[in-house]
Amino acid sequence: VLGGASILIRIPGHTLFYSGDISCTRQLLLAGCAHPDEVSHVDTLIIESTQGATDDDGRCDYEEETHRLGSAMRRVLKRGGSVLLPSFALGRTQEMVNIVANLQMSGEIPFVPMYTVGLGRAVYEIYDKFSSYLHPGGALRPLSSTQRLGNVWDKSVVDALLRKPC
């Protein structure tokens, strides 16, 4: 998570390490976490994590999954359908927008409008403001390239959206 931080606290006879939500896997926008070398011995470890109990060995390769997503999106869009990618507002939305943008730019999927809403869009603005902290190779797609959807609870907004591929 952009802005995630950790702290190592040493008191006589005890060492505590606290970390916010982390991912050690390199992503498109963020490098994987890197903890300082001096964290070799910790008595108490506290980690805030969305998927802390998952086994990294069971995960698929990032590039492979990106291409699988592109393939699935291409099939849906070819049939004239729309693709909905619900994601967490903090971190995941920003990553997904950029994955889709890269798939479009590489020609794996056609250019269709992308929409972002709510908190995911607001967090994207923060990523844009602090883009110097992002992974150097992870070029953040300008937020202006995505469109505002409006009130997603208004049926007419959703109906209008789904009339053409997006």
Where are the language model's segments positioned?
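His/Asp/Glu-rich metal-coordinating catalytic cores
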Residues: 1-95, 99-108, 113
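Hard-cation-handling environments
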Residues: 69-166
